[in-house]
Amino acid sequence: MFTVMTRQPCEQAGFRALSRTPAIVTLVVLLVSIVVLVTLTLIQIRHPQVLPPGLKYGVVLDAGSSRTTVYVYQWPAEKENNTGVVSQTFRCSVKGSGISSYENNPQDAPKAFEDCILKVKEQVPEHLHGSTRIYLGATAGMRLLRLQNETAAREVLESIQSYFKSQPFDFRGAQIISGQEEGVYGWITANYIMGNFLEKNLWHMWVHPHGVDTTGALDLGGASTQISFVAGEKMEPNASDTVQVSLYGYTYTLYTHSFQCYGQNEAEKKFLAMLLQSPSTEANISNPCYPQGYSTAFTLGHVFGSLCTEKQRPESYNSSKSVTFMGTGDPRLCREKVASVFDFNACQEQDACSFDGIYQPKVQGPFVAFAGFYYTASALNLSGSFSLTSFNDSSWDFCRHTWSELPALLSRFDETYARSYCFSAHYIYHLLVNGYKFTEETWPQIRFEKEVGNSSIAWSLGYMLSLTNQIPAGSPLIHLPIQPPVFMGVLAFFTAIALLCLAFLLYLCSSFRTKERSENAFDQAVDSD
């Protein structure tokens, strides 16, 4: 009698199969593949790095009455309470006059931009050209041209639009902004770069500064001037000069007014027109605001061709007729005559009134005066804040200098500006003191500035800040430890290895089960014999 040992076929066959070298190697490879797959998946899921979405760029062309300036701004693509934290990175002055001077040849207007736009392309990373928005805002010069010749104004803008459509940037149009918009954007710029909206705390996070008052803005251009500030007193209901501004989660109620035809250049034309109206039998006209020893000839078209002076045209107006102005350098008479540029009587002793019958609440708090205000003060060797007495003394002293003395007095001599600084000084006095009602006590609260840090004080930055409210924020970028294509490739490779190993092991197990059954059948046959 034989005793037959029983065994589980699959277990014994599987054990014998797995005990052999190929099976062991395959099993090890399978386990390693599974470990690699699990490890890579956990790393990819649990350790992603969230990166900020990078920088965005914007370009604004400030098309003023006398020149065009190109500004490049950048800001983080994520936003602080829906407004981008914008900084100026580049500034370029376009050669030539303002775009309104191309009234008779609008097709030539864009040609002057080419040098600056070429530099802008270098400043903005090439891969961002297509997403960089570019805007052109035209101010008082074009506002006057539109009133005078709407067709010419439209053709100038169309020529510019056609030019920028051929550029790689995302051009968003050329438009004429209103005087009120110019005032608001200038106020936004001044307060932004002075840190009145945002500041960095100890953790380098942007926060709203506690207890900081806003700063009023005084802008003096070539064809208009703007005043903007948050009034301390309650303003007249439904006042057309009241604007609400929302930035960085806060809302400000702002008084702002733009005086068309009261920019430096247009105001001086009004002054020259007034001098021409004075009865005189002399061939030459005395100008107390021009330096002694200086004379220049203008055509009547230069003086009276503007919309601001057409009402002062003489009956026998001949635009090509020339008239010579002789400088006498008389500061007292200059100040006296410059007052006639304004209509102070229209306010009729009203306290809340500036000039020409325009409503204005009482000025209060600090102000920053920029553009023409700054350049005139700089010519008088003044900057920052100073007393009204200092301004008057410097004005009187400057106006007494002869024309031959001015080149040594000015750091940068240009005939057009040099001859007009005396007029501008007395004009600013009347505008700020008799117009806006600044006094001996409040005058020192005005700071005459060109820029703060690396940012120019101009309406263009405020314009860009307002536009970032409308530009979608960038989405955060998820930076994975392994790039998705690489991860998917590695995942597919080790998954395939694991499946092949598993299939091979199943094959070995199946083969040995078949062999074991054959051996059992053979053993039984032998036993029966």
Curated annotation (Swiss-Prot):
It is a multi-pass membrane protein. Keywords: ATP-binding, Calcium, Cell membrane, Disulfide bond, Glycoprotein, Hydrolase, Magnesium, Membrane, Nucleotide-binding, Transmembrane, Transmembrane helix. The chain crosses the membrane at residues 23-43, 486-506. GO terms for biological process: nucleoside diphosphate catabolic process; nucleoside triphosphate catabolic process. Residues 1-22, 507-529 are cytoplasmic. It is found in: Cell membrane. Its EC number is 3.6.1.5. Pfam families: GDA1_CD39 (PF01150). Its cofactor is Ca(2+); Mg(2+). It comes from the Eukaryota. Glycans are attached at N81, N149, N238, N284, N318, N381, N392, N454. GO terms for cellular component: plasma membrane. Disulfide bonds join C92-C116, C261-C308, C289-C334, C347-C353, C399-C422. The active site is at E182 (proton acceptor). Residues 44-485 are extracellular. ATP binds at G222, A223, S224, T225, Q226. One of its GO terms (molecular function) is apyrase activity. InterPro entries: GDA1_CD39_NTPase. It catalyses: a ribonucleoside 5'-triphosphate + 2 H2O = a ribonucleoside 5'-phosphate + 2 phosphate + 2 H(+). Catalyzes the hydrolysis of nucleoside triphosphates and diphosphates. Has a threefold preference for the hydrolysis of ATP and UTP over ADP and UDP. Belongs to the GDA1/CD39 NTPase family. This is Ectonucleoside triphosphate diphosphohydrolase 3. The lineage of its organism: Eukaryota, Metazoa, Chordata, Craniata, Vertebrata.
